[in-house]
Amino acid sequence: MIRVLVVDDSAFMRKMISDFLTEEKQIEVIGTARNGEEALKKIELLKPDVITLDVEMPVMNGTDTLRKIIEIYNLPVIMVSSQTEKGKECTINCLEIGAFDFITKPSGSISLDLYKIKEQLVERVVAAGLSGKRKRPVSQTVRPEPIVRAVVKPELSKPKPGTGRQIVCIGTSTGGPRALQKVIPKLPKDLNAPVVVVQHMPEGFTASLADRLNHLSDIQVKEAKDGEAALNGCVYIAPGGKNISVIKNSEGLQVVLDNHDTPSRHKPSADYLFRSVGKLTDYEKVAVIMTGMGSDGTAGLKDMLTAGNVKAIAESEESCVVYGMPKAAVKAGLIHEIKHVEDIAASITSCVKKERV
């Protein structure tokens, strides 16, 4: 049984979230709190496994409360965010601090709209409960670096003569914002490839994520726009609610955004991106799958490997918030290197050499 504490300054939200969670057999709501100070007292008293935490509250806000929870109790926290600009920025900050994941409060007719997020809420709480306590950082001196050989053996470094063209694609979900913060800022600004990122996230939040990563990085980071050129030395974050692909035209690579649905139901979808990149037959590709629930990215990576000329990297279990997406690709035999999140940028950079010979 997963024991949950619900923290929100709205009595309506406390009741609705509690009711939704209580309907799930493996979840027990053991208490509620109206603000951060009350939450900290109840955590000590009730010993929950998972906490849902409103981002914007009086007395002690969600960000400050989250810091205390992680510092003192090291428990998984699901943030409950408004869709205001302030709410979005605070949510991205909370994910970077170490929140497990987040859901968005309803924006329209409150009772009807809230039911749309019930499935997401339950899924995230269950995943958080199964993940146990948040993992402490692992010493870099003791990290193993296992290698898993691909079942389909791709041609890794044989682009067409004289091209030297390369592209990097990354897929991630739960835990991704914090993981990306450990990868993107370490990439050099003169990286000789565009980087296209799929982070499972609702519409509106990816712009805040891109802005935050751009502020932290030497390499340029932006939310992708339909039809723009995919240029070397730039990171393109797929907008929430859209699928992203990359195509080749007479001038180079171009970003395409659309509303196509995928079997995984994710939008953006790593499978969708990877399949499009796999079609760039005269490009060297680096595909990275990082922390996240589910298996998005595995099917697309398999297609990329079949097309060839790919280096596939997965985040290690020890550094993942949720070892789902990388695990699926590893189990399928599609991964060449398994790397701790702290080492992924170096691995990408070594694959994407500044000069080709």
UniProtKB/Swiss-Prot annotation:
This protein's record includes keyword Heme: no
Enzyme class: hydrolase
Superkingdom of this protein's organism: Bacteria
Any GO molecular function: protein-glutamine glutaminase activity
Keyword match Cytoplasm: yes
Residues annotated as catalytic: 173, 200, 296
GO cellular component: cytoplasm
Transmembrane regions: none
Catalytic activity: [protein]-L-glutamate 5-O-methyl ester + H2O = L-glutamyl-[protein] + methanol + H(+); L-glutaminyl-[protein] + H2O = L-glutamyl-[protein] + NH4(+)
Entries under InterPro entries matching the protein: CheB-like (IPR008248), CheB_C (IPR035909), CheY-like_superfamily (IPR011006), Sig_transdc_resp-reg_Me-estase (IPR000673), Sig_transdc_resp-reg_receiver (IPR001789)
Keywords tagged on the record: Chemotaxis, Cytoplasm, Hydrolase, Phosphoprotein
Domain CheB-type methylesterase: 161-355
Main localization of the protein described in the UniProt heading: cytoplasm
Modified residues (4-aspartylphosphate): 54
Pfam families reported in the protein's UniProt record: CheB_methylest, Response_reg
Post-translational modification: Phosphorylated by CheA. Phosphorylation of the N-terminal regulatory domain activates the methylesterase activity.
Enzyme Commission designation: 3.1.1.61, 3.5.1.44
Location(s) in or outside the cell: Cytoplasm
GO biological process: chemotaxis
NCBIfam families: PRK00742.1 (NF001965)
Domain comment in the entry: Contains a C-terminal catalytic domain, and an N-terminal region which modulates catalytic activity.
Family to which this protein belongs: Belongs to the CheB family.
Function according to Swiss-Prot or TrEMBL: Involved in the modulation of the chemotaxis system; catalyzes the demethylation of specific methylglutamate residues introduced into the chemoreceptors (methyl-accepting chemotaxis proteins) by CheR. B.subtilis has an effective methylation-independent adaptation system but must utilize the methylation system for adaptation to high concentrations of attractant.
Protein name: Protein-glutamate methylesterase/protein-glutamine glutaminase
Species of provenance: Bacillus subtilis (strain 168)
Gene this protein is translated from: cheB
